[in-house]
Amino acid sequence: MTTAPVVSPSLSRLHSAPASPFPKAPVGSGAGVAFPARPYGPSLRLRSAVMAASGVGGNGSPMAPEESAVSSRLGEVKRVTKETNVHVKINLDGTGVANSSTGIPFLDHMLDQLASHGLFDVYVKATGDTHIDDHHSNEDIALAIGTALLQALGDRKGINRFGHFTAPLDEAAVEVILDLSGRPHLSCGLSIPTERVGTYDTQLVEHFFQSLVNTSGMTLHIRQLAGNNSHHIIEATFKAFARALRQATEYDLRRRGTIPSSKGVLSRS
């Protein structure tokens, strides 16, 4: 004689699937589950406000432009002379997208470093009298980038203003210190051992930064700490510059809305 198993009422309740409080979506319909709305309390509002002000999302990643209350800072310059035709666009709040075609391959490579390590979106298109040499194109591109940077910074409210970074590249190491002060000054302490990297005249490195400083109105110090490979020294310089510029242009949460100067203004002198 077989006896039917006895199931405890409490055990039955334990193993039975509870009714879901959420409506079921039809299989294959692609409809999502409707979750009940949660109250948006003061603590959650405060946390969201802090994240928005600091440009950080809920997972700690940088916020996309649509998530942040701060609009992207953009600059665009077209410079046309009898020697060159230059078009530059820069987004200080970008993602590191580079689109450069300058007619100078090594300079394109360096502008890629500026975008990638600064997390700036950088667009540079240029044609010029490179059949003579790269001097005019190199200079006018830097002048246009500096002017676009000046536009993008606007009144400079809330930014860190200062940047400092040391970048190594194998045996080379270069330190960059900068101040978005409105006062153009360059001190360049590079010792590049060869006259050229590829077809690029290495004298043009200092001239590039001098031209950029002149139109952007920044104070820039470049100091070579080590290095004997010309390519490495120059690339470490651009990487350190990009990182320092990123620091200087990013927002200081405690200073949001105010100009980072004791005199209350940052302008070209």
Curated annotation (Swiss-Prot):
Binding-site positions, Mn(2+) 1: 109, 136, 231, 235
A GO CC term assigned to this protein in UniProt: chloroplast
Top-rank taxon, per record: Eukaryota
Full protein name: Imidazoleglycerol-phosphate dehydratase 3, chloroplastic
Signal peptide start-end: none
Originating organism: Triticum aestivum (Wheat)
Cofactor binding note of this UniProt entry: Binds 2 manganese ions per subunit.
InterPro entries cross-referenced by the UniProt entry: IGPD_sf, ImidazoleglycerolP_deHydtase, ImidazoleglycerP_deHydtase_CS, Ribosomal_Su5_D2-typ_SF
